[in-house]
UniProtKB/Swiss-Prot annotation:
Lineage: Eukaryota, Metazoa, Chordata, Craniata, Vertebrata
Function field: Binds cAMP regulatory element DNA sequence. May play a role in RNA splicing.
Principal location listed in the UniProt entry: nucleus
Sites of Phosphoserine modification: S3, S110, S115, S420, S425, S431
Name listed for the protein in its UniProt record: Luc7-like protein 3
Keyword Nucleus: yes
Compartments where found: Nucleus speckle
Modified residues (N-acetylmethionine): M1
Pfam families in the record: LUC7
UniProt feature coiled coil, ranges: 124-181
InterPro entries (alphabetical): Luc7-rel
Amino acid sequence: MISAAQLLDELMGRDRNLAPDEKRSNVRWDHESVCKYYLCGFCPAELFTNTRSDLGPCEKIHDENLRKQYEKSSRFMKVGYERDFLRYLQSLLAEVERRIRRGHARLALSQNQQSSGAAGPTGKNEEKIQVLTDKIDVLLQQIEELGSEGKVEEAQGMMKLVEQLKEERELLRSTTSTIESFAAQEKQMEVCEVCGAFLIVGDAQSRVDDHLMGKQHMGYAKIKATVEELKEKLRKRTEEPDRDERLKKEKQEREEREKEREREREERERKRRREEEEREKERARDRERRKRSRSRSRHSSRTSDRRCSRSRDHKRSRSRDRRRSRSRDRRRSRSHDRSERKHRSRSRDRRRSKSRDRKSYKHRSKSRDREQDRKSKEKEKKGSDDKKSSVKSSSREKQSEDTNPESKESDTKNEVNGTSEDIKSEGDTQSN
């Protein structure tokens, strides 16, 4: 009844007898009523039903859904069910191994008994047969002697005795052959190395196939394969923590190396920043020094420019006054000369006036060119003063001061040239 109920539970579920409105029982895979061997793969009690190795019915729950839940859970192969299952299967294999050893021992013992038992009776029968043969030969000789002597009745009695001895000898020979045939049949047995059952050597193939496809043989074969598979899984499972620990250590070492490299990188970056800040400060100081030197040079150049411009303006005003006075004098002299020289021809006056105009134009153009050259030189000197350092500013001032006398000389020369030209022009007019 229990096995039938379990079969119905597997087919229809444990709540098969509940009404639709009744509450169903929700059993977890870790409940005590659940077969842990079934969760790990199969229940060994289901393998050997109605066989010599029957383990009896399993009273716990066998549910495929619970096994799937266990396989999907985070505690899969971590609770210890697989190790218990492996120990139970190994105990079953140890039992069948003992059975196989006992079978081999029985075969060896029976073979020894057969060999010793067959040798003993056979030897005794041979001896009896040999004794009977000797007696028969002796009796036959006696019968011949009695027949030659004419003792027929005695010879016939001995002949009957010889017949009895021959029958006894044949009986002994037949028993010996029977024992040998039985011994030969006993030697053809062997033990199955999987389930421990006795097999006949050279038996029909159908009977061999029936044995290989039987529950007992297939059950123990499945147990052996499952044991090897579980050993491999558990070995890998035990190696995984070691590997995880090793990988964790390697990861920690890598992180430490990365942190060390990061610290070194940050140290180099800080050092580089400090050096950059120092260089920037040095550049700022250099710029400040250059600005100061430029300001000093600009101040000195401006003062020198002011002095030069003042001297130039003074000279220009003086030269302008001189030119104005000369021009007035010339106009006066010309008007006087015109009044005095009315008799001269107008053409000659025109030519002379043209020559004077040309000379005055040339003089003005030369003075204009000299003024432009002087301005360009001053601009070049200002640019060079801005580029040079403050140390050379004093030398530039000296050079600018040295150049002032030259300009004065040039101005004086121009003035002298102008006066000389004016004098020449007046002389020409007077000579005319």
